[in-house]
Amino acid sequence: MPIKIPENLPAAEVLREENIFIMTEERAAHQDIRPLEIVILNLMPNKIVTETQLLRLLGNTPLQINVVLLRMVSHSHKNVSQEYLDTFYKSFDQISHRKFDGLIITGAPVETLDFEQVDYWEELKEVMDWSKKNVFSTLHICWGAQAGLYYHYGINKYHVSKKIFGVFEHSVSCEDSPLVRGFDDTFWVPHSRHTQIKREDIEPIKELMILSESKKAGVYLVERKDGRQVFVTGHPEYDPEVLKKEYYRDLKKGMDIDIPVNYFPHDDPEKRPVVRWRSHAYILFNNWLNYYVYQQTPYNLDNIDQAIL
């Protein structure tokens, strides 16, 4: 089944070219199905790129999904016009009265700041607090995962001496969770961050469970045991060229940056990157939508309060 998004959203044309089914609102209205209601809090600077990455993964399921794009009004956006935001994005005030099956909180290029120094931190806290009673399951990505763990559980992030940058091998730490069904024994995920969370800070918290780790990139996948919160420290949604663009961007700035590991053939930036993580990304998002959203959320979203008690 398809995702339902605004007809003129730029990401829609890209997804159509990739043969991903986009449904118009008119056609969706004729299907006697309650679609999943998913809100994406997009904190990344390049809105269109991130929209496309996430919608691509959400569109590869047998479920009909209505997508709402959410922005932080307390942040001044430099890489997208106000007209674009007004056309395609909602403010929290516009959606706070609603309930949703799922929420995705993206990463953001603010990890070197203390959480309280981020200009939209107070607004983000409001969204995360609201999600506890109005969203059935929330998927946090990269800095979004760090922010969620810090806000909900007091788990802080730590700076690393060398940027964790490249595509890293991971393994499953707990096979009991539905979220890791279908994962290979070892699988690959992109990471691009200057900070990390630590296993020893997570283990004492009885509500949380570490599902996957990497020897070199650290803790990757954490969930609340009831599936209502999922924390992903990497970027499984990344397009093939993202790390390449980040590498050349940092070089242009004169930064001391290493070639992303396990990415370019023979570590040659002139060669086309090797994509090792695509199938893992699809499985992860499919599992989250199927096991933690579709199969668990009540048919009537107004009953979410009772379902999550």
From Swiss-Prot:
PANTHER family: HOMOSERINE O-SUCCINYLTRANSFERASE (PTHR20919:SF0). The active site is at 142 (acyl-thioester intermediate), 235 (proton acceptor), 237. The lineage of its organism: Bacteria, Thermotogati, Thermotogota, Thermotogae, Petrotogales. Pathway: Amino-acid biosynthesis; L-methionine biosynthesis via de novo pathway; O-acetyl-L-homoserine from L-homoserine: step 1/1. It catalyses: L-homoserine + acetyl-CoA = O-acetyl-L-homoserine + CoA. This is Homoserine O-acetyltransferase. GO terms for biological process: L-methionine biosynthetic process from homoserine via O-succinyl-L-homoserine and cystathionine. The record marks 111 as: Important for acyl-CoA specificity. Its EC number is 2.3.1.31. The keyword Transferase applies. GO terms for molecular function: homoserine O-acetyltransferase activity; homoserine O-succinyltransferase activity. It comes from the Bacteria. Transfers an acetyl group from acetyl-CoA to L-homoserine, forming acetyl-L-homoserine. One of its GO terms (cellular component) is cytoplasm. The gene is metAA. Keywords: Acyltransferase, Amino-acid biosynthesis, Cytoplasm, Methionine biosynthesis, Transferase.
